[in-house]
């Protein structure tokens, strides 16, 4: 049984931390919409038929990087986030004219009962990151109930396996430079910032924020568990840059990634 008071306290703490990071979010976290990123979400959104007659919901919209495109393409747009600071930044990004076309909701992603069977496309970009797996499951079930029959969920989740891939490359470089295995592991742990991660359970902690990073099999498992079908997974490919632990000349290797998913209700 979930202790509701504990859950509410955790949500309040996370709302405060996410709001505090809202102004500099785009500078701190890797942007799946940045130039040079290969993001399958754009093609998936472009494939939605008759978007002008459909309702799209950006769940956990954050600072709203996707909202201008959604507002231009879809007939009705919902922007939901539990952090008021994020919604404030999203409104600023849109500007007054576009913001009037968007319905803003300040609430958690699992609070969708009043939207049951009203959404055609639900989008979640780096927002299914709750550190409690029970809340992730509850949120996915809520999203499925909010979708009309045949509606689609699509989104991006941060990848824990890409951190392990990055670590492997750094370890090899350190060994090739003559470090001992023990020295190479310390070098890798420092530059890949292992202190922030729980690799067994996909946990991430940074300046008060707590997030879930995903293995691909978890995406398949949890979406299926929530009742979704026809699931597909693709990589969001990021060019190597400073946020990946410094310039260690990794450009000769395949890029790092997050996971893009889409499924049908």
Region spans (language model):
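Class I SAM-dependent methyltransferase SAM/SAH-binding core
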Residues: 57, 63-111
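Core SAM-dependent methyltransferase catalytic element
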Residues: 246-265
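A short glycine-rich, Lys/Arg-flanked "PGG" loop and its adjoining helix->strand segment in the class I
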Residues: 137-149
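Conserved S-adenosyl-L-methionine
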Residues: 229-239
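Acceptor-substrate binding/catalytic loop of class I
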Residues: 131, 203-218
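Conserved class I S-adenosyl-L-methionine
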Residues: 1-51, 154-185
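A conserved beta-strand element that flanks and buttresses the S-adenosyl-L-methionine
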Residues: 123
